[in-house]
């Protein structure tokens, strides 16, 4: 049930990242964000100068599969500034998460830069359960590269191998 001050207004947040690949940690951030916002846009930043572990198309397909039954989550890709993408999708907040103080200092710096460039855009830091705070995309990539099982680090039902040669 919406409170009176939210009638007619959706609270939309953008959760930007490379998501290469999308992990249980990312999934937990989205779950926390959905407690605060009506809609969360998972926005995959596409750096055309980098070749990712997974193609951008594969990352998008993987995340869309995770949220196929959740109309409150949208998945997009972008090559512009995150603040510009936030405006394009109607977001008033950027959702981020931190695992430690180093992450916090970095996110605070980015949040202040965004506040300077986009006065109407807030940054919201969410904390994820301790069970997933150690999970990162780089950990998944490294373990996979050395032949280790990464299934427990990915959202349920996601097999990384299904996306490695996606679209080729």
Region annotations inferred by a language model:
Residues 2-168:
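Nucleotidyltransferase catalytic core that binds NTPs
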